[in-house]
């Protein structure tokens, strides 16, 4: 007799499948594939030729937690800027090459950590593979075969009718085979599409067909809200199956926002240690406090807190006490006041107007107890200082 036959739900499988076995490459100092942690990357939006602006944006990405950065190289002026950027960047730099095979050699010579090539729009690319493989191999520079639905080779479009998952995979594996003929396997692959369903199907096929590390991305995902949804759905499905070694959330938004979303996706799946997590109820007719405002003010007040801390902001006595007790720190609100919980214990009850101030003070105290080095803007608030929320 089984649990199912007794009407008892079977023991659920682990939430995530084991990571897919893949080769490992090094993008600068960052391992990709081979069981390494899933890395988060982004792409600069500056003119690469503007070295100072590009380095400034890379510094902002570094502070946000980015691990690898890609820069566009559409012109000779951009090529000329690569040596300075590669030398001064705090992150490994990937040169993004389209149309011009000769720029690949220039990027390798400039000291870039990796090169992305798009086989769909480099006409002479196939003829240059032998030379590229030798140059990249000699320099220890990996190549990303970056296939994109928007620039798929016309021959494959004619064969498949449109940019199907099968067409994307065929393009990627064909280009990989050309490198393999010359003994070069320091490769990672991406097969991006703007439709998450097609994208997921393509990566699943690719994961079964090869052992190269995979870079996940939904191309042209859209503005921040839409792009976040598309990437979260697609990445969540694949990463839960163990597929994916590095990710880039493409958003029509500042690059730093891509890093925030990417890191949050990994944290949500348990693939990265959680940072600050605000748990708040969606509010309903039972709420006796403005939950939206409380949650926003607590989030803003603790931005940059470098510890895995769960803070619950609850608006009523139904789920509030339970959620607050499960969190590291929380409040259950009602009747113009809030019960403050720390590690499951009520430590005080404060007037509604002091809830945000108290939560921030207690969060900073817990962070210091955990040995966290607080950012300058938070350090002055620690130690019981009064917090003013505007």
UniProtKB/Swiss-Prot annotation:
The keyword 4Fe-4S applies. One of its GO terms (biological process) is terpenoid biosynthetic process. Pfam families: GcpE. One of its GO terms (molecular function) is 4-hydroxy-3-methylbut-2-enyl-diphosphate synthase activity (flavodoxin). It catalyses: (2E)-4-hydroxy-3-methylbut-2-enyl diphosphate + oxidized [flavodoxin] + H2O + 2 H(+) = 2-C-methyl-D-erythritol 2,4-cyclic diphosphate + reduced [flavodoxin]. It comes from the Bacteria. Gene3D superfamilies: Dihydropteroate synthase-like, Sulfite Reductase Hemoprotein, domain 1. [4Fe-4S] cluster binds at residues 281, 284, 316, 323. Converts 2C-methyl-D-erythritol 2,4-cyclodiphosphate (ME-2,4cPP) into 1-hydroxy-2-methyl-2-(E)-butenyl 4-diphosphate. Belongs to the IspG family. This is 4-hydroxy-3-methylbut-2-en-1-yl diphosphate synthase (flavodoxin). The gene is ispG.
